[in-house]
């Protein structure tokens, strides 16, 4: 793992966007794995800026997202599809038929998981996977104890994870209890992985990620099994290193 520290999250976001832009420049039809939450927002803003200043085009690119809430329609205000449209897709030239998320509203979620794995395989696999990290070491919605050989699957959300996401809903009761997530094996099958972490709340988990052994109780430790992982952090997230 290559860990690079920046002064603040804005610089971190610019560098993450630059890495993504270089991936697209070298392979215009690259498949990008994308993430949601607060951490990638600066990265997405910078990607929009690069597009608007005609330094970057997504016309040939395809994207797949890590996860989606179960039980929410894609057009629900708190779905990850809505998040991606609001923060990236609606502001760039990525064709609508070239971005993909799991369908959390599917009547058969298990079948949807299989469909999503097949989709990723059919479009050539992921060239660069963007990740955040939870305070318990979760990546995607892969909570502690998730097998490292897991592919896309339905997961019951940890209560701490639901609490962390409650700020996006009017109450904790509205936060879905389940989600579809790419599994740890799905993530590790990406050619390159780019993990972002910012803020003091991520300092302990970054310290632990560096020091811990590889173990399913800390899902992010699986990244040590991959040969091309870059971790970008800001000074606050690196304050306990």
Swiss-Prot record:
UniProt KW Disulfide bond keyword: no
Organism of derivation: Bacillus pumilus (strain SAFR-032)
Stored Pfam families: Glucosamine_iso (PF01182)
GO cellular component: cytoplasm
Membership in a protein family: Belongs to the glucosamine/galactosamine-6-phosphate isomerase family. NagB subfamily.
Gene Ontology biological process terms in this record: carbohydrate metabolic process; glucosamine catabolic process; N-acetylglucosamine catabolic process; N-acetylneuraminate catabolic process
Alphabetic keyword roster: Carbohydrate metabolism, Hydrolase
Described function: Catalyzes the reversible isomerization-deamination of glucosamine 6-phosphate (GlcN6P) to form fructose 6-phosphate (Fru6P) and ammonium ion.
HAMAP family attached to this UniProt entry: GlcN6P_deamin
Name of the protein: Glucosamine-6-phosphate deaminase
